[in-house]
Amino acid sequence: SNQPHFHKVKHYLDMAKANNQIIAGGEALDQTGYFVQPTLISFKNTDDPLFSEETFGPLVGVMPFETDEELIQLMNQSRFGLTASIWTNDLSKALRLIPKIEAGTLWVNMHTFLDPSVPFGGVKASGIGREFSDAFIEDYTELKSVMIRY
């Protein structure tokens, strides 16, 4: 991290503190560098700026929902779509939800696991590029077909 990004993350933390949304964490670490504690934030509605921004900090937001349809609607209304994670004891439910979630990378019962053999990237405003795997090469190349009779 760098100082401007640290201040951006601190700004989001200050907003969450002012709205009494911090469940755990929320403090800058007292050490050299630009670090903050992993932080759990409670969202009350989707108008919350923290709900709609990519912070790229150790901030995780949670919001209650009643139905699977409401969950999908909440998740997909974000203009971003880099990653998402589902935490559940019901694997069949997770498998039903996966195709409906607009995210380039989706984890079930884990988060931030990256495998170099699997493409990683986003959708929507999070970008369309991919890193890792053969998809990385294909994303940055253009195919050209050439046929020659000699």
Model-derived segments and their meaning:
Residues 28, 35-150:
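Conserved C-terminal structural/oligomerization subdomain of aldehyde/semialdehyde dehydrogenase
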